[in-house]
Design a protein with these regions (language model features):
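N-terminal Rossmann-like dinucleotide-binding module
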Residues: 1-40
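Internal alpha/beta domain cores that form substrate/cofactor-binding pockets in large enzymes
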Residues: 2-4, 25-29, 56-78, 83, ...
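A residue-level signal for conserved active-site and pocket-lining positions in enzyme catalytic cores
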Residues: 7, 29, 53, 83, ...
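Structural motif corresponding to alpha-helix initiation and N-cap regions
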Residues: 13, 46, 68-72, 118
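Donor/substrate-binding cores of folate-linked one-carbon enzymes
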Residues: 22-25, 82-201, 208
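A short, local hydrophobic-aromatic micro-motif
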Residues: 27, 146-149, 246, 279
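N-terminal beta-loop-helix "entrance" segment that forms/cooperates
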Residues: 35-54
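An anion-binding loop in the catalytic cleft
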Residues: 209, 215-307
Length: 307
């Protein structure tokens, strides 16, 4: 089966490698342009999928947007049987979806119709779900609304971070993708329409959403901090200076929301109900450090308030 692969971040790499490893004919890879890095923006970092494709000698396409007659012609010339999309980062137009002979499938890290949208991994943790998984979906014009081809449910490990769950589901997604494509190739797969009435959504993570609201209960705050680790990072302010928090667990404690309860041996901060113990922090413009090092460096004291 001849495949054209659309993907960008680390999440997509296991699916790409599974296709190559299982002998699928990956004719081309479409990924986002290299991103400028550093203060001068003069250094460019290639997407992880680009590096993986180059290592296999597979042609790479990096349009600013996957639209236009010239781009559609390039994809058509690859003569794909199927298109595979895994965290590519752009919505694909019907003209593109129609090019592969058997359409396009998407590797989506949730059990659709739950958590349609851009950030299903993080929202699964933020919402306190106990189970998530991966769906292989036939793509159509709507937002993650196409028929379900294959699903693998997985229990969400306790205290997992967004980054850890993403890596875990990326491997599950690669397995699900290979299984689904094998069934498609055999003509043995049956699609199932989604129940749109049961759909929930996982919108893009905004800076404001990542700001910690200390009036919430400790369990919800710990989920927020874990779910947004490593990116974008849940943040708060101490004396007007931004700091991101990581490695949070709900704990006992009482005080005004955002109040530092103790700095002895650990950083414990009062929530609307209970308290949150924090292991690591990241001051603005710096790397992650232990909470203990930050406490010593900033002179953080019990009674101060985070906001």
């Amino acid at each position: 089966m001849r495949v054209v692969f659309f993907g960008t971040p680390e999440f997509a790499v296991p699916s790409f490698r599974a296709l190559v490893g299982e002998g699928f004919d990956v004719a081309g890879v479409v990924t986002q342009p290299d991103k400028p890095q550093g203060r001068s923006r003069s250094r460019f970092e290639p997407p992880p999928v680009k590096l993986a494709a180059q290592a296999e000698g597979i042609p790479v396409f990096q349009p600013n947007r996957p639209t236009g007659a010239a781009f559609y012609r390039q994809i058509g010339e690859l003569a794909p049987d199927v298109g595979v999309v895994a965290a590519y980062g752009h919505i694909l137009k019907p003209e593109l979806l129609a090019i592969p002979r058997r359409g396009m499938v998407n590797v989506h890290p949730s059990l659709l119709p739950a958590l349609r949208g851009a950030a299903p991994v993080e929202w699964a943790i933020l919402n306190g779900l106990e189970t998530s998984g991966v769906t292989i979906m036939q793509m159509e014009e709507g937002l993650d609304s196409g028929p379900i081809l294959h699903q693998i449910p997985e229990r969400i490990p306790p205290d997992v971070t967004g980054g850890e769950l993403s890596s875990y589901l990326a491997e599950i997604g690669a397995q699900a993708l290979v299984e689904a494509l094998a069934l498609i190739e055999q003509g043995a797969i049956a699609s199932k329409p989604q129940d749109h009435a049961r759909a929930t959504y996982a919108p893009k993570l905004t800076r404001e959403l990542a700001r910690i609201d200390w009036t919430k209960d400790a369990a919800a705050l710990a989920r927020t901090i874990r779910g947004l680790d490593p990116k974008p990072g849940a943040w708060t302010e101490l004396q007007g200076r931004e700091v991101k928090l990581f490695g949070a667990t709900a704990s006992d404690g009482q005080g005004a929301p955002g109040e530092v309860l103790t700095t002895e041996g650990r950083l414990l901060i009062a929530a609307g109900s209970g308290a949150v113990a924090v292991e690591e922090v990241q001051p603005a413009g710096k790397g992650r450090i232990s909470a203990a090092d930050w406490i010593r460096g900033r002179g953080v004291k019990a009674g101060q308030r985070l906001s």
